[in-house]
Amino acid sequence: MNMSSRIAYTLTTLFVSAPALAAPPTVFIPEGSANSVLMVQAETGKVLRRINDVEAVHGLAGAPGVPYLVAGSYSEIPRENVASLEMPSTVSADDHAAHHAPKAAPMGPPDAGISLLSILDAKSGDILRRIEVPGAVHHTAVSPDGRFAVATHPAGDGISVIDLATFGMTAFVPTGSMPNYAAFGTDPNLVYVSNTGNGTISEVDLSRGIVRRNFIAGDTPEHMAVSPETDRLFVADADAGQVLELSLSTGEKLRTFEIGGEIHGLGLSNDGATLFVAGRGEDKLASVALATREVRTAKLAPEPYHLTVIPGSDILYVSSRAEPVVWLIDTSSMQTRETVSVEGEGHQMVALP
């Protein structure tokens, strides 16, 4: 075997025997009033696909290794119009028929309209199923084991619980006034729900369909981030311009971080050492070093809104509430690397490896 043949053989062997390189993360950006979800390549912002026919999509959630994304609509449909909804092109006839099969007595407030959760394939983005829930959906969350999804209903003062094995709604759990955001820790059976209207966080047992505990959390708790390693829950007290650090074990408030102005999205760095905060009211992005309490800010305008940290990366995605743009931010310098143009406005973004 000559030298060229040996080199070619060696390279071929390496490529065949080496494990396949992991695909770069994908970011799913709900585009709100555009009725669509944009899929982009996380590192570059390159557009991969636009998923259409997801009406008034605001909430979107998934989890690593879970094959589904759950998208919530902020619009409602009169009950009498549900049967006439057009079948999405990617939904099978059997699934569509199951969706319109006779239902048991509706759960939730009796005067609630009907909203739809869309179940998306987490790889392709195809719409697989629609699920009826009682009232407009603000945010959604998916349990780490992929068993449950939840949707918050601000007008209904509770959450819907979905079994992702059967795509059935199993419970409506009253939590408090104007439930806003939902987040899981390490226990896939427990979800934490911020109730903006009464300043509490509800710990909900999803198997039992009950609230186990309520924590006091400022005046207007909205977005949250969980640090499972440290047993901490970070809560945006939006109107107060503060982030509260709570103990998940006791519900006790441990620290308060002053950001200033109205705040919105939260996200933890991949190493859990830094908390990022979207300062919507003062057009800024803030980072909090949790070990030292140091707060750094950088100008970001207009109106930074939702925020998500890209796994295994030094990039942070931040949407604008005022313009159709998402910024790709370097987590160290807090400067913009790239921008992604969106239709409508970017809401609860999901980044999956």
Predicted regions and their residues:
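Bacterial N-terminal signal peptides
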Residues: 8-19
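Bacterial N-terminal signal peptides that target proteins for export
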Residues: 1-9
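Predominantly soluble domains enriched in secretory-pathway, periplasmic, or organellar proteins
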Residues: 19-353
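Intrinsically disordered, low-complexity segments
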Residues: 2-3, 15, 263
